[in-house]
């Protein structure tokens, strides 16, 4: 029993250590890179997929990735994203094609870590000229854990870019979280050439060109924001495919789509008012609410209306404090009469009925009411007829769906009137000017969303019908009453108007904004020192900052709710000289290098060790190793799977080798060695995750048989996360999705050679499918089962083994001869054909 206990303890400890190495929080890895030298001397390379674990780099400001090749540092750097992915930064020309916003980024901070002050420097930083700070010691209160989670999830930050205007940022030294601990805040200026924050924390005006490209949100930021209370949170997941950067992919929810469709149908039933033709003083006020469709009338035959002559005004501040109901009523009543080319508001309705318009009597029983739907509902049955004139009058066609529909427009005065004056005030308050949809994003940015940017990404009715899933897009912005909301806040507001004909109370809207709207706040030096400011403070700070830039003045900086200052901090900033905006370069993310950049790496023929490292202040240097292989365009490549092909099974092939058990097929090492001696290159392609790169490479180097090991070659793994790769391979059983994309990309590197792949080894029909997709013939596709039986796909009835295939390796894998050869030019003069005895003549007619 002691032996059994010791064995169980050993197995448990080994599995525990293995899990620690595979934990996504510490999982790092790099996929090998293949560089192919072309016939003209240029180079092509496969993507650089490098990923650092979440705990490998705690602080996102230290995002410069250094590269060493063969032990020597190179003048090439990568940038680290918030989810741990590394990528190159390329500057675009002005005349180059447009780049998707998610691929845009800020330049690499060349200053490195030397540009950041240390902890001692933060506390004793000298005061810059022109900056006067007055204030007393502040008392720091202990933050609650729940408050910390909200700060980590909802806080947003701003990146300081080099330009004509430089901003001064207050730095605060972290202090112990004791009730009596007190520290004095000292100022420090931010170097202009340092970009300490991640891409997801950049404002679009700071890191992009003058074209209205929105700021690309990093992956971890999108993951954190998906943790907010939202019905779509469970549908979000990271998707990282071969040759591309990671992105958030969301699955569509059928039940939610049905709700949206029903809401759209109800919105389609809203009436449209004809253009006024008389003075508004001739009639009273209508109190028409959205009508209700009768079950006998098809809602899809009507379209929501848009008013072509509606007035568009720029939004000063999307987070401005909302006006009270009394203020709204006074403003609407005190407004002057609008011109005839503009639509009438609730307080200035028209009374003239167009000629030929059917009038509905206000007599008893003329209108069908429902006590649950409010006093202003009307059925389509109340209309005398639904001819083309009435349909065009009440339901005109429009280009945009619920985007430009005016909910507050009353119908004709004589069509529906309310005898109760209380309803007038109610409808005046419970009205929405218009609702518009746009994919412009920018709700978390400190700057307001411009009207041009909002209009540029406007969502039309056709866009919504073709892709209802765009409502799940994190960049969706809903404009209601000249205010911007995300869908999580706008959906309850729209539903309340449609179902109850009433607006949500201001307290409810404010609560929704605090819970589900991305907050706008300042970015402090440390990732755990992020502040959240209320909307009122944001608005006042932006107004003061704009005034400060035009003319120098003393600005009062408000602190957050966790710091209670005895006196305000006063900043005296000198006026900045006005400068004309010049050309701002645009940078994009890339995973590949150009031919000139590859030439500067001075790669050796064959394998080149590469180390990607990120240096942090508290954790030291986090390294990730990989290999760059330099091949020629005319090399012949043999593809080999790992799990189930080199190992005896898929699942146990991951576990048993870590326990010291040899779980490889007999004879495969010697077979691969003989094939390699004939001049063939080996490429190992597996659907394992990128975090298992070191584990997989160590296993392939450990495999040995009769003193010879497996040939060296690039190990191409899936760049997705560990659990995504296991789900795709074990649950979905679709590893060919990755392999087809990967092998097709490798095949493009060998152009103009039509087929660089000579043979392939696998263990599943999925592997055979992937190999066929890249043009391999069935005669050179081999599959092996767990019993070690090797099957050639062309002759499936014949079974062999790796040992037997090694005996005839010269026939299936003849030696590769480079350059001109008489054997290849004239096969009849080869050693085999020229010296062999001629075949005997057989008279088939005599045999018949």
UniProtKB/Swiss-Prot annotation:
Enzyme class: hydrolase
Top-level taxon of the source organism: Eukaryota
Renumbered ranges of motif LXXIL motif: 652-656
Motif extent (Nuclear localization signal): 135-144
Protein name in the entry: Phosphatidate phosphatase LPIN3
A GO CC annotation given for this chain: nucleus
Residue numbers spanned by region Disordered: 97-233, 271-298, 314-373, 536-568
